[in-house]
From Swiss-Prot:
SUPFAM superfamilies: Ribonuclease H-like. Its main location: cytoplasm. The gene is ruvC. Residues 162-194 are annotated as: Disordered. Mg(2+) 2 binds at residue 68. GO terms for biological process: DNA recombination; DNA repair. Mg(2+) 1 binds at residues 7, 141. The RuvA-RuvB-RuvC complex processes Holliday junction (HJ) DNA during genetic recombination and DNA repair. Endonuclease that resolves HJ intermediates. Cleaves cruciform DNA by making single-stranded nicks across the HJ at symmetrical positions within the homologous arms, yielding a 5'-phosphate and a 3'-hydroxyl group; requires a central core of homology in the junction. The consensus cleavage sequence is 5'-(A/T)TT(C/G)-3'. Cleavage occurs on the 3'-side of the TT dinucleotide at the point of strand exchange. This is Crossover junction endodeoxyribonuclease RuvC. Its EC number is 3.1.21.10. Binds 2 Mg(2+) ion per subunit.
Length: 194
């Protein structure tokens, strides 16, 4: 299984590609950062990120895309750009019929280091070790993208949807899923005039 990990960002969007073989054997394929210049308009920045992600998906034809789930941060502009980049990754995957999984930073850290509160340098070292790399991937966005791909490969739920996936959710993930379902129901009911 080829897994493409995405660490979303508007200036630097990390992309890491691995292969998960039998017995969870992981192999490095590619790592890169898709960039957009802060000197161009927002629409052109989004287009640059979308085109870069689309090119990677077309080039590597992943079986799954693993994207960092965006959480609120204190810097509104940062979270907006990150959420937009995550949405572009989901769109590019959906257009190609590729299943998408969202993983929190804590999940990725836990999967790769065994510690959900691990520091960035610990994650980078473990990514390097797990994938047998000769040096740490840089910048950090690239290492994070590989960590997300590794997380997806090692998670028992993977990209499963529905009940089987729900067995493996943390309490916070269950609350998030319930809130998303309730929001969807409210929207559908309001569209029907209920």
């Amino acid at each position: 299984m080829i897994i493409l990990g995405v660490d979303p960002g508007l200036t630097r969007c990390g992309v890491g590609v691995i292969e998960a073989g039998e017995h969870r054997r992981l192999s490095f394929i590619h790592v890169d950062v898709v960039r957009s210049s802060p000197d161009i308009t927002q629409d052109l920045r989004l287009l640059a990120i979308y085109n870069g992600l689309s090119e990677k998906m077309d080039r590597f034809a992943p079986d799954a895309v693993s994207i960092e789930r965006v959480f609120a941060q204190s810097n509104r502009n940062t979270v907006l750009g990150t959420a937009q980049a995550a949405g572009l990754a989901m769109l590019a995957a959906a257009q190609r019929g590729i299943p998408v999984a969202l993983h929190t930073p804590t999940e990725a850290k836990l999967a790769i280091t065994g510690n959900g509160q691990a520091q960035k340098v610990q994650v980078e070292r473990m990514v390097t070790r797990v994938l047998n790399l000769t040096k740490m991937p840089t910048p950090a966005d690239a290492a994070d993208a590989l960590a997300l791909a590794i997380c997806h490969a090692l998670r028992p739920a993977g990209a499963l949807q529905g009940g089987e996936r729900e067995q493996h959710l943390t309490a916070a993930q269950r609350q998030w899923a319930e809130a998303a379902q309730n929001s969807t129901r409210r929207r559908k009911n309001s569209d029907r005039g209920m």
